[in-house]
């Protein structure tokens, strides 16, 4: 029996009926069995690919991508995933569409969705705006489908919003499952989700938030470390605490990278912008103050530069379990 057939039989045992016609906004919206189903399907697709078997389930159709922030890895991952399943990819560049002339989200959403099976959206730079935009877009499609404008309603995959980055975090999680020989072996493992200096730009909060929101669901000991002022959304921290309590793991915050790395099985250094600055950026965005946003960006880079000692070095890695922690980014 092939691995794919074994995985398919396992899939039949899971309670996943509610996934049909659902969207993927945040990992904490999904049940444990729904997350398990996603991992199972991913492993089946991987097995088929490795054995040079076709993974096409569509003869035609579109995967629409909308990147309202720059992307390399996620852009190519989404395009590769669509191609793997038999979908053509069409990327909507808002600056080259009628959106630039004032067309509404409601109009655009229905127009681009006529032949679409899936829509991936990234909107991550402004606190309180990214998830809202994705919801507004999909609410317009609900209306279009209800009114007979669309013959089918495509599903949404969040390619990173202001709250979560579920595709990256799920891929990270599956990698850890493989590295440690099964999801059951992750229980009790310490993962350090730490801020790290970057000279580039004020990055979104959604990666650290997605990590603590997902990895606490598997009984792991999750430690978040960052300089003062670089907090994440308190509501996501509450989710992490509840997850840890429910699964026998733990969640805590520390003030130094050294404490987070001490005895860690996995380390995840990643830069993100200060929470207060992200809120200020959103206010400037609402005013259409691009000059203010540019000035804030310079301020953020200067603030980041005050914490250049927050870096993953060989000496820092020696603090981890046997000096051999799994490094992720």
PLM feature segments, named:
Residues 103-107, 205-210, 284, 309-312:
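Charged helix-capping and loop-helix junction motifs
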Residues 68-80, 177-291:
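Glycine-rich phosphate/diphosphate-binding loop of Rossmann-like nucleotide-binding domains
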Residues 2-76, 80:
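Positively charged, low-complexity intrinsically disordered leader regions
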Residues 270-328:
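Glycine-rich phosphate/nucleotide-binding loop
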Residues 56-177:
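Phosphate/diphosphate ligand-binding glycine-rich loop within oxidoreductases
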Residues 147-154, 220, 319-328:
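A short helix->loop->beta-strand "cap" motif at the edges of active sites that frequently abuts
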Residues 57-63, 187-189, 324:
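Phosphate-coordination loops involved in phosphoryl transfer and adenosine-cofactor binding
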